[in-house]
Regions:
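Conserved phosphate/anionic-ligand binding catalytic regions in large, soluble enzymes, centered on
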Residues: 8-11, 58, 62-63, 225-227, ...
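Active-site phosphate/pyrophosphate-binding segments
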Residues: 7-45, 140-142, 148-261, 271, ...
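Glycine-rich phosphate-binding loops that contact phosphosugars or nucleotide phosphates
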Residues: 32-34, 41-187, 218, 253, ...
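Phosphate-moiety recognition in structured ligand-binding domains
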Residues: 2-12, 24, 138, 271-273, ...
């Protein structure tokens, strides 16, 4: 039997694993969150800063609305390691700063940890790999419970990180009653995962013809829009920005043509009606405009994936994540588009994003 390292794993394998692992992690909420809660020294910080990049940054954004609702008196910010290290490294009294890196090998995250240590502050790292290089740069290493994920285009890690941060906020804010909402969101995400295959099949020609892709959402679904833009850009290799729904119609929409692909994410919050209106407007220009929503009135529309009703709008990004993950995976697999240009090897030799300990299992270089 092949070992984990010998088997060729795909994004799809980890997307399929995610609901099970998420449910297992929710059952382990006390165990998983205890180390980070211990870093709060018996109280609630006045400020929390999550320092993360790439998909980890997006996972933090997915968690942010729910975290803020559980910790209304805490200022919670998500910043990149670059911004932290170069522009705002000072750690204030009463502030919890946690640096996030799934691999534990991201050079910018390690630099941020070093910047914290240089102030004689406690360097806290959230990671999926406690045996990584990060342990040499951090004072506290917290495993958020992703397990093994060998594919570089991470999916299970995003889902489990968002869930971990939500569990942490619920526990820290004494809102354990809201853990049931997280269970409902996991169930909704599993339903979205299952429904995305049919959605992709219905819209296969359009989704295999992406030239420029926009992901558009209100604040309530900003995290999933950011992650969708990143995953499509990483794997399908087309320009793929993300916009807030109202910012989208103040300039970025002016370049639209029928050749553009657009994904709209309706969080089901107060901005939902506006989001759906802008989606309908986009369809006047492009037939490749799509919507993910919980609004049952769209049932039967082949361009819309109707998700189950959510326990709260703050969970929209977590529930919708499998949609963007699978669209990127199915499209890039069919197209064989994730292979990188050979000149990128020269780029990485000059400006590396990972330490020398990093092993690329994707075969995409």
């Amino acid at each position: 039997m092949a070992t984990v390292e010998e088997r060729v794993w795909t994004m799809g394998d980890y997307i399929e694993e995610s609901p099970r692992v998420a449910r297992e992690n929710l059952a382990r909420a006390d165990e998983l969150t205890a180390p980070l809660i211990a870093c709060c020294d018996g109280g609630v910080p006045t400020r929390i800063r999550l320092v993360a990049s790439g998909s980890s940054y997006n996972a933090c954004q997915c968690a942010l609305p729910f975290m803020e609702s559980c910790l209304p008196d805490v200022q919670i910010r998500v910043v990149t390691p670059h911004r932290f290290a170069y522009y705002e490294p000072a750690v204030a009294a009463g502030e919890l700063v946690a640096v996030v890196t799934q691999s534990g090998l991201s050079t910018n995250a390690l630099e941020a940890l070093d910047a914290i240590r240089a102030q004689d502050r406690r360097a806290i790292c959230l990671t999926g790999n406690v045996a990584s290089d990060a342990r040499e740069h951090a004072d506290v290493v917290v495993d958020w419970g992703v397990g093994v994920e060998l594919v570089g285009y991470v999916t299970k890690g995003v889902t489990t990180l968002a869930l971990f941060l939500m569990m942490f906020a619920a526990k820290l804010g004494a809102h354990e009653d809201r853990l049931g909402e997280l269970s409902g969101a996991i169930d909704a995400a599993d339903a979205v995962r299952a429904a995305t295959y049919g959605f992709f099949e219905r819209n296969e020609k359009a989704l295999l013809s992406m030239a420029v892709s926009y992901c558009v959402a209100p604040f309530g679904a900003r995290g999933v829009a950011l992650e969708g833009a990143l995953k499509i850009g990483e794997t399908v290799h087309v320009p793929s920005p993300a916009y807030e729904v109202e910012e989208f119609i103040h300039g970025p929409n002016l370049q639209l043509t029928p050749g553009y692909t657009l994904f709209f994410f309706d969080a089901g919050d107060a901005a939902g009606e506006r989001t759906r209106l802008v989606y309908r407007a986009a369809r006047e220009v492009s037939d490749a405009a799509f919507l993910v929503t919980t609004d049952a009135s769209f049932a039967g529309d082949p361009h819309v994936l109707v998700a189950p009703e959510l326990p709260s709008w703050e969970l929209a990004s977590l529930a919708y994540l499998p949609f963007v993950q699978l669209v990127a995976h199915l499209a890039s697999s069919a197209l064989g588009s994730s292979k990188q240009h050979p000149l990128l090897k020269r780029f990485k030799a000059i400006a590396a994003a990972k330490t020398e300990s990093f092993v690329n299992y994707d075969g995409d270089e």
